[in-house]
Amino acid sequence: RHFFSSESEADGWRHLATERAAADPLEATVSVDQHDVAIIMYTSGTTGLPKGAMLTHGNLLWNNINASLAFGSSRDDVILTVAPLFHIGGLNVMTLGSFHTGSTLVLLRNFDPVQVLADLERYKVTHMFGAPAMFLFMSQQPQFADTDLSSIKNLICGAAPVPESLIELYGTRGVDFCQGYGLTETSPFSAFLTPEWAVSKLGSAGQPPLYSDTRIVDADNRPLPPGERGEICLRGPNIMKGYWNRPDATAEAIDKEGWFHSGDVGYLDEDGFLFICDRLKDMVISGGENVYPAEVEGVLYKHDAIAEVAVVGMPDEKWGEAVTAVVALHEGQDLTLEDLREWAGPFLAKYKLPLRLHVVDALPRNPAGKVLKFVLKEQLGE
């Protein structure tokens, strides 16, 4: 292991500037092919250890071609990037997309919901990408009601399923969501829901972009018809080359026909719109019934007392797994399991209702805003 300092020398550390000055100069020109690896972007690690996805120059280019066609991007846009650049959404959804079209880029160091609201108004931002949690926290600020959002064409939302209540809330401010679905391994976008479909296809992640294919398969990798739930598989020039130093994981993720197996559960409707149900690994099996946490979370988010919610499955002697709701409450609010079950009863089948409730100050999240459910399970297990 090597430690480098860029500011001053320290005992046992190597000085980066000194070594760089002594190094042989790079070749003036380097030949680059679209199949060459451009970056190694690590997955978010929400279900375990992150893996390094090798993304090529072609992957990045085709992602931005797909995004530009979907968003109708132009050089007149003002793009705000607040998602971290080590996250594929922060780097390749908006930032490289802005370079691609030559638009104005507002680049923030970190996410502060009050600062973001101020900058949306100050710079007359037209597009912003964020995780649902970011837009949720923004909406919870007192400044939200008075912020001028009239310049916004689209808020692009990804990284997790978007609660319908959040879509409806921003709709009251005249702001449209362009929901997207994708993964680090897909550079990332693999589906778009543009504003004209926001009402009629509410809850959908959209359609595959022009240069990408999507299909749903069963456990035996057989394609499923519209309306049936299965694993979402993706193919196109935006799919990664493989995982860095993980040929085993690459072979497991990308089949011989070039389909990337996402590990996400979803279905396509009759019109080819993709609906995301949940991660396969997050699915709870309670009493032999499959429960998709995202569905339960979407309902619970509508409860007036709940600020944040995550649903996980915890071991249970009777049911195998117990549907467990972990919530952070709005200030001054109280909530009991009995009250929550009674409130949610009209909206969820009985087997989907939480059997346990844990109230916390905040949910554990990674820097991209995704809830770390494996951390939650570890904490609850302790």
Q: Where are the predicted features?
A:
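AMP-binding/adenylate-forming core of the ANL superfamily
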Residues: 215, 226-240, 259, 265-266
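Conserved AMP-binding A3 loop
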Residues: 38-62
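Gly/Ser/Thr-rich phosphate-binding loop
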Residues: 117, 122-130, 139-200, 213, ...
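Conserved AMP-binding/adenylation subdomain of ANL enzymes
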Residues: 61-78, 86-127, 141
